[in-house]
């Protein structure tokens, strides 16, 4: 069996949803394993896919709920529940014809109802009523949606989505969008069965398999916090002949033991393994597996750091008085200070903690989306954005937005931007050094190393008399409660 497997090397970031869905839609492969076993890093806090777009939720939902369209392995949009669609001449109305006979199932595999056009109307209404964090992508696109979300209208029938009949769903847009179909692949646009939604009430979408319905290639069989997530192939799936993996088991991995991934792979417990060039067993693994170690292509997902410019909670902080809190807030609201931080971050060193020196540049991205994400006339998004950057000052002239190289890091530019910021901030009574709290999960070895790398590059570029990065190590739950899973702004 081992000879049939491949190790995934230092340049890869695995997403269970994308990997498993790709397996489910792959071409026939007689050697493909019938069970896929690997790891996951974060429990989903909710399965209410219409309302949350968190990756921990999306990783699950991508394998269990189908929408109108999906992407093939090349990124092309292809039919899923919509077997055909058309666009009006003015580009404002998109009409999708649904497959007949596609069913909703419970987590136990019991047939619940047929998937119908009204389910897509219900899904969008549930997203709007639940103030979904994915609405920003849609509210200016779909006619009447922004007014409904803001409360200007309380009549959802004025929103540009309707079930023409049981198998035809229609969307009306505010203006033509040539890229509209890419939006229907988002979780906010997935169908929801109204009867089931109402029957579950507040329990709908809680992180238990029975809280949602399934129409996709897999059924979620178990979800045990910080332990395991298990799926089984949906035997009644409309496209079951193209689902090649029968069962999936993902075991929780907290990042504390890098060597455990390759150990489990070697022992046959995992189907694949993420390798860390900084781990103690990397060289011996290279000798054993040789050319079976590969770098994956850079994926479309972007990971980025953000700053909290309106912090309200200080339950976890290194700050010792109110003056430090006020000074930090003023600094983060200052454009030149933020630019100084941007230029001071050594991205190559940061990613090398994960991928080693050889693979560090393979995952560097210099813009929020890939530079060639969209074409506008003869130019890519990256080319257009790069031309616009120059208008922000000469410091951006030599910054390239292509992937694979850190073109932003420059201690010299950081110092220039910081000097401007310091003058502006001192005029407001801000005191230095500015203290920046950065929370990190204490058991995640790589995350701690990356955060320390960030601290080193910023402090060496700007000077500790000016900026101090305070690394706050804490548990996974503590970190999530003040960041991505904070329930209200006052907790952040």
Which positions does each model-derived feature cover?
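Append "and occasionally in soluble cytosolic enzymes with long acidic Gly/Pro-rich linkers
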Residues: 332-460
């Amino acid at each position: 069996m081992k000879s049939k497997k491949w190790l995934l090397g230092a340049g890869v970031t695995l997403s269970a949803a994308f990997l498993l869905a790709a397996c489910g839609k792959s071409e026939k492969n007689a050697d493909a394993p019938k069970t896929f076993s690997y790891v996951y890093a974060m429990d989903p806090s909710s399965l209410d896919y219409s309302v949350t777009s968190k990756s921990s939720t999306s990783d699950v939902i991508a394998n269990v709920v189908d929408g109108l369209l999906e992407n093939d392995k090349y990124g092309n949009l292809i039919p899923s529940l919509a077997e055909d669609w058309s666009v009006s001449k003015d580009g404002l109305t998109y009409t999708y014809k649904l497959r007949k006979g596609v069913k909703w199932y419970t987590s136990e595999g019991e047939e619940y109802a047929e998937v119908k056009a009204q389910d897509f109307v219900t899904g969008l209404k549930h997203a709007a009523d639940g103030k979904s964090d994915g609405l920003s992508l849609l509210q200016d696109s779909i006619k009447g949606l922004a007014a409904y979300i803001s409360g200007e209208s309380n009549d959802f029938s004025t929103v540009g989505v309707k079930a023409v009949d049981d198998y035809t769903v229609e969307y009306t847009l505010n203006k033509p969008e040539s890229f509209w179909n890419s939006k229907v692949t988002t979780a906010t646009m997935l169908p929801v069965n109204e009867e089931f939604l109402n029957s579950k009430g507040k329990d709908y979408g809680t992180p238990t398999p029975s809280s949602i319905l399934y129409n996709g290639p897999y059924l979620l069989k178990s979800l045990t916090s910080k332990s395991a997530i298990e799926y089984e192939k949906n035997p009644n799936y409309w496209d079951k002949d193209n689902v090649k993996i029968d069962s999936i088991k993902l075991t929780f991995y907290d990042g504390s033991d890098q060597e455990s991934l390759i150990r489990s792979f070697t022992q046959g417990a995992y189907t694949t393994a993420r390798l860390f060039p900084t781990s103690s067993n990397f060289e011996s693994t290279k000798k054993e597996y040789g050319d079976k170690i590969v770098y994956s292509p850079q994926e479309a997902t972007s990971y980025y750091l953000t700053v909290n410019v309106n912090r309200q909670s200080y339950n976890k902080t290194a700050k010792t008085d109110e003056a430090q809190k006020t000074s930090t807030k003023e600094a983060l609201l200052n454009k030149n200070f933020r630019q100084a931080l941007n230029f001071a971050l050594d991205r190559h060193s940061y990613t090398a903690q994960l991928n080693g020196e050889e693979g560090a540049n393979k995952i560097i991205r210099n813009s929020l989306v890939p530079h060639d994400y969209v074409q506008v006339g003869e130019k890519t998004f990256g080319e257009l954005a790069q031309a616009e950057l120059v208008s922000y000052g000469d410091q951006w002239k030599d910054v390239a937005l292509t992937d694979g190289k850190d073109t932003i890091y420059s201690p010299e530019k950081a110092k220039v931007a910081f000097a401007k910021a310091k003058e502006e901030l001192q005029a407001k009574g801000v005191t230095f050094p500015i203290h920046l709290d950065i929370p990190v999960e204490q058991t995640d070895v790589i995350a701690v190393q990356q955060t320390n790398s960030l601290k080193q590059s910023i402090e060496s570029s700007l000077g500790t008399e000016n900026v101090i990065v305070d690394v706050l190590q804490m548990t996974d739950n503590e970190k999530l409660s003040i960041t991505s899973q904070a329930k209200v702004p006052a907790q952040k």
